[in-house]
Structure formats: structure tokens, C-alpha cells
Amino acid sequence: MSEAEAQEPEPVPQPESEPEIQKPGIAAARNQANKKVLATQVQGTVKWFNVRNGYGFINRNDTKEDVFVHQTAIKKNNPRKFLRSVGDGETVEFDVVEGEKGAEAANVTGPGGVPVKGSRFAPNRRRFRRRFYRPRADTAGESGGEGVSPEQMSEGERGEETSPQQRPQRRRPPPFFYRRRFRRGPRPNNQQNQGAEVTEQSENKDPVAPTSEALASGDDPQRPPPRRFRQRFRRPFRPRPAPQQTPEGGDGETKAESGEDPRPEPQRQRNRPYVQRRRRQGATQVAATAQGEGKAEPTQHPASEEGTPSDSPTDDGAPVQSSAPDPGIADTPAPE
């Protein structure tokens, strides 16, 4: 017996099952279903209900007892409200169950099983309209890059013939918050397809020059649409003022321009003080006036007492003779 017992296989331990993740609403409903029911279809008046915290109290009409109510206990909520809630002073119908700390409400509805009105502080659901977006047409089966709507595709599947001069479908602009400034969208595919068609036509048929009427009307299929350029802003041309010629010398003569290329003058300092320039200009004018007076005054030589002419030449190079005294005047004695 001992050998038989030793040969028996040992039991393999089974792995423990992982706990299921449950939503709070489903878990609360299951807990309420497992709780003991004290009364059913009891009517009462909502004493107060906090929408943010999600709980409140209901005063029973029969026993005047306050019953705790949670937002998960509301069975039929207002379809226009985003959150489950009951309004203050609203008459509701509910079941009373035994909770951990006392009586609790369950399966809360309006009187007669209608949805509750809800609290005025509860947010309403967002009103939106359902928009039916057209699916983008497949570009592989298109000819000439023309977009076809689903309605036109259904008609084309029946007849498989559409008008050749059908305008391409325009894409709807994006919403305002998706738009970007200075953003250029992708080029339409009809240009590439048109270029392929033009090459095929040129191979099959003889090239024919477009007439002047076609060019004037703008129906040339080979000519792509003109591109729109935005002209850049350029600063207007403002010529610089000519440099003023500075006078040299006190006689007001300006410097004559030589035939040779003059050397460029060094750039002046723009931040020189104004007083310093006035002082330099005053000193230059004083020196120029002194030089001019020295040139204008001739040299004067005194006449000799004997009346002989002076041999010293003047600036002009001609000798200057002194006038002889009058004999009558010289012989007369001076009065005493």
C-alpha cells in the first residue's frame, strides 16, 4: 500500500483567477441588488442633492425619514442632462434598501417610473448636429482628376456614363481653428492628369496650334492656371544729398575740382559736439581775415629830408619819388 500511495501523482495547484475590473456604476448596482430590500415604490421629496459630490438625501413621505441617495442609484435620468442628479424639492419614487450606515435609496425614478427632472445645476448635454461627411472619391478610377460624389457614383454604376465637362469637386475649407496663415494647400491632381492626357493626344493626333479665339477665351487645355504671386514690399529709393564744398581761404574761393579722380574724403564724425565746430570755424575765419589784410596794405617808405627819390621798389616793382618842397615856402621863416 505504501508503494501505491507513493506512485499516485500529486495534485497540481490551479492558478488563481485575476479579479475582474468593474465599473463603479455596475459595481454599485450589483451591491444594491445584493442588499436587503426594506420597502419598494416609496415616494419622497428630495431634501438636497450635491451635483459635484454626487449624493444627497430624500425625505420619505410616509415616515418622514431621511434616506441617503447616491447618483448611481438613479435609474432613469433626464436625457437632456449630462450627469445623473435629482432636483431639490423634486418628488421621486424609489426603493429602500439596507446600507452599511443606514437606509439607502435604490432604483430612483420619477413618479410612475418616468425619468427624473434633475438638478438645475447639472450641465446639459452638448447640442450638436450630425454631419454626414462625403467619403473622398478614389483617384485611381477617375479620369482627368475629376471628383465624383457618392450620389453621382451610384448613378454612374447604373449607367457608367457621366458628362465629360463635369467640374471638379471643391474641398470644404477647414474649421477656423485649423486654419493657418500663409499656408499653401496641395496642388490639385487634375494638372498631372491633364498633362498625361495632353501627351497622349499629341501622340495620337497631329499637333494643332490653338486659335486666337481659344486663347482669348482661356480654354487652352495645355496652359496651366496662372500662379498668383504676392508682391514684396520694397523701401522707396531716397537719394543722398550731395556733399557740400568747404571754403578754403578768407576770400571765399572754393576748391577747384581737378581732372584727376579725387580721393574719397574720410567720413566725418556725426557725434562731434556743436561747440567744437563753432570754435574751429571762428579760428579759421580770424586767420583768413588777418592774411587778407596783410596782402591788401602796401609797404610805405618815409621820404628823405633832402628830397632824393627812394631807391626801394614797391610791391609793384616801380620806384616811388618823393615830391620836392616848394622853394617859396621853404625860404620863408617861421613866425615867432
UniProtKB/Swiss-Prot annotation:
Organs and tissues of expression: In adults, expression is restricted to the ovary and testis.
One Gene Ontology term from the biological process aspect of the record: positive regulation of DNA-templated transcription
Keyword presence, Cell cycle: no
Record has RNA-binding as a keyword: yes
Reported modifications of this chain: Phosphorylation activates in vitro RNA binding.
Predominant localisation class: cytoplasm
Domain (CSD) ranges: 44-108
Low complexity composition bias: residue spans: 282-292
Region (Disordered): 1-22, 103-336
One GO cellular component term: nucleus
Compartment(s): Cytoplasm
Gene Ontology MF term list: nucleic acid binding; RNA binding; sequence-specific DNA binding
Keywords: Cytoplasm, DNA-binding, Phosphoprotein, Ribonucleoprotein, RNA-binding, Transcription, Transcription regulation
Biological function: Has a dual function in oocytes: as a DNA-binding protein, binds to the Y-box sequence (CTGATTGGCCAA) in the promoters of target genes to stimulate transcription. May also function at CCAAT-containing promoters that lack the consensus Y-box sequence. Also binds mRNA to promote accumulation of the transcripts it contributes to produce.
Subunit structure: Possibly forms a heterodimer with p54 in the 6S and 15S mRNA-binding particles. The principle component of multiple messenger ribonucleoprotein (mRNP) complexes. Component of a ribonucleoprotein (RNP) complex, composed at least of elavl1/elrA and/or elavl2/elrB, igf2bp3/vg1RBP, ddx6/Xp54, ybx2/frgy2, lsm14b/rap55b and, in a subset of RNP complexes, stau1/staufen. Component of a ribonucleoprotein (RNP) complex, at least composed of lsm14a/rap55a, ybx2/frgy2, ddx6/Xp54 and eif4enif1/4E-T. Does not appear to directly bind lsm14a/rap55a.
Record PANTHER family: COLD SHOCK DOMAIN CONTAINING PROTEINS
Record protein name field: Y-box-binding protein 2-A
Organism this protein belongs to: Xenopus laevis
Gene that produces this protein: ybx2-a
